[in-house]
Regions:
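Short, solvent-exposed beta-strand edge segments and adjacent coil->beta transition regions
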Residues: 53, 96, 154-158, 199-203
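PLP-dependent enzyme catalytic core of the Aspartate aminotransferase-like
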Residues: 5, 109, 166-167, 174, ...
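Short acidic, gly/pro-rich beta-turn/loop elements at beta-sheet edges
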Residues: 66-68, 169, 214
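Conserved PLP-enzyme active-site core in the AAT-like
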Residues: 1-129, 134, 140
Length: 228
């Protein structure tokens, strides 16, 4: 979405714009600089998929500090975290260590996620066995122009596409187990069915694995399904 436009609308309405920045991550987007008052981000990719539980970071814009409106933003963040069953500021030493190690390699890993997502999106866009490939880095995406001014270092790690005459569950079952069981934010590309296994939509989060191998594995599974 156009965060600048949403930020302006929020200010005019005297509202707080809250952004879930998990997919793009702080590496790929800075909502606070674009007009958000509060940014929330699950730290799966920061921790390279190794966190023992869900960790979420909440960031408040400096403008909120200057206006002494921290309370409203902080209360909003606290309510959202509590509603997700998450507690604040209670990291164990192991969790802190995983987070620290993840931050040391974050930029390199995130760039790899983004680059591989783009490569896989381009492969899928040229694949006649799928349709409606959705990735903001493709010029065919309706938000491509907006995304170029909102996102940084690429266009994020996520790609969605639809299958033709096959269900998401069929494709996922035809792929090696690691494509569905690998931890979120980890090194292995992960596929899921956001509209259920009986739907046709696949969501792919690129890992740091070889995109050529991932594309070949997907291609083989799609071709096998086409012969059934």
């Amino acid at each position: 979405p156009d965060l600048r436009a949403l930020g302006r609308a929020a200010r005019e309405a005297r509202a707080l714009l809250v952004v879930d920045n998990t997919v793009a991550s702080a590496f790929g987007c800075n909502p606070l600089r674009l007009g958000a008052a509060l940014s929330l981000e699950a730290l799966d990719r920061v921790c390279a998929g190794e966190a023992p539980r869900k960790l979420v970071a909440a960031s408040v814009a400096r403008s909120q500090l200057k206006r002494h409106r921290v309370d409203a933003a902080a209360e909003c963040a606290h309510a959202l975290l509590e509603g997700s069953g998450l507690a604040a500021l209670d990291l164990s030493s192991d969790e802190a260590e995983v987070l620290e190690h993840g931050l040391e390699t974050l930029d390199t890993r995130m760039q790899a996620h983004f680059d591989r997502a783009r490569a896989l999106a381009e492969y899928l866009a040229a694949n006649e066995m799928v349709c409606n490939v959705r990735y903001p880095g493709l010029t065919s995406h309706p938000d491509h122009a907006v995304a170029t001014g909102i996102l940084e270092h690429g266009f994020g790690p996520a790609v969605e596409f639809d299958l033709i005459d096959r269900t998401a569950g069929e494709l996922i079952e035809a792929l090696p187990d690691e494509f569905r069981t690998s931890p979120a934010g980890g090194a292995i590309t992960r596929l899921s069915a956001p509209r259920g296994k009986q739907g046709s939509t696949i969501r792919l989060f690129a890992g740091t694995d070889d995109p050529l191998i991932v594309a070949a594995t997907l291609d083989n599974a799609l071709r096998n399904l086409a012969t059934l």
